[in-house]
Amino acid sequence: LSYAENKEIPSYEEGISLFDVEATLQPDGVLDIKENMHFQARSQQIKHGFYRDLPRLWMQPDGDAALLNYHIVGVTRDGISEPWHLDWHIGLMSIVVGDKQRFLPQGDYHYQIHYQVKNAFLREGDSDLLIWNVTGNHWPFEIYKTLFSLKLPDIAGNPFSEIDLFTGEEGDTYRNGRILEDGRIESRDPFYREDFTVLYRWP
C-alpha cells in the first residue's frame, strides 16, 4: 500500500503543524511525557495562548476506570518558561498556557508541555499495556502531523510485542497512520477533533 505524505498547513491558517510526543516509562512506573507542539498562530483563536485538555480517568480494557495522577513539570515557548495554570472539569484537567494580559503576535511557535503520569499503564497477564490518546480531541483547529514514541527503561531498540493505533471519533477503529520500524507511530492525514490513540504491549 502506498503511504501519502503529510499535508502542509497553509500559511494563512491557524493550527498545529507538528505534535511530537516523547514518552518514557521510568523505572518506578511513572510515565514521563514531553509534548512538542509547533503552532502556527494567526491571531484567530490563538490570541494569548491555548489550553491542553488531559483526561483524569482512562477506561481499561476490562471496563474499570483508573484515576490518572499528573505532575506538571513545566511549559516552555521557544525554550523559555511560559505562564500556565490548571483548570478542573468533570473528567478533564486543562493546562491553560499563556498570559491573558499579553497578546501573542502572529508567528510560528514551539511549545513544550512536560508532565508525568501515574497509573497510565496496566499489567495484563504476563505483559504490560499502555493505551494513550496522544493528542486529545478538543483542539479547535487541525493537527497536521502527529508523532509518538515510547521508551522503556534501560532497553534499546524496539522491545514491544504489539503496537497498534486507532484514529477517528470516540469508538472508531480507523488507522490513519503507520508504525515505523523503530516503534514510533506517525499520522498520515491532518486531524480535527479526532482521537489519535496508540497501544503498546511489552513483556
Regions found by a protein language model. Give the residues of each.
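Lumenal/extracellular ectodomains and adaptor appendage modules
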Residues: S2-P203
